[in-house]
Amino acid sequence: MLPANFEDDASYDECTDDLNRVCADLANAAEDTGIALATISDNNIFFETKREYAKEMVTGFIRLNGMTVGAVANRSKVYDAEGNAESYEQVLTVDGCKKAADFINFCDAFSIPVLSLTNVTGFEATLEAEKDMARAVAKLTYAFANASVPKVNVIVGKAVSYTHLRAHETLAN
């Protein structure tokens, strides 16, 4: 699924999956986007990275029509094998931003396109997070803006925008 080095192009393999298949349970996977990523990928294979770190942000690799794609998504629930759910707020966290930024930089270094699924209502609002949030969000923003690979974002729920931050009023002054 991954290239051996940055010059290798092992990111494409023949697609054996039906591209016109119906993803019946996709609507139910908005909370745990790891399930959504597995559902949309070729042969339902999702290779998750850093599974135990910043669980509210999922990163990993999927194949779409045979091409390796890096996937980044935030999630509000994580389901285990027995169907038990661990819940998270729909916010960006410091660790989640760092995890996503590092993953995007990795994908860019190996020329792997990035797909992101977004369902976030804001930023973590704790005293501890307040110290590092601006730096972490800036790192994530820079990683997305600086990456030279194709990037596609799909909003699967809510998303924070300039309107939410009231930037339109600040920038107008």
Where are these regions (language model features)?
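Glycine-rich and small/hydrophobic secondary-structure elements
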Residues: 131-153
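A glycine-rich phosphate-binding loop feature that marks nucleotide/adenosyl-phosphate handling sites
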Residues: 5-17, 55, 117-124, 156-162
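Long, structured protein-protein interaction/assembly regions in large complexes
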Residues: 48, 53-68, 72-109
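Short glycine/threonine-rich loop-to-helix capping motif typified by GTGT followed
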Residues: 84-87, 124-137
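Generic beta-strand/beta-sheet core signal
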Residues: 65, 72-74, 110, 115-126, ...
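Secondary-structure transition/capping motifs at alpha-helix termini
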Residues: 105-115, 142-150
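Conserved small/polar residues in nucleotide/adenosyl-binding loops
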Residues: 163-164, 168-172
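Amphipathic alpha-helical segments at domain termini/boundaries
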Residues: 1-63, 69, 73
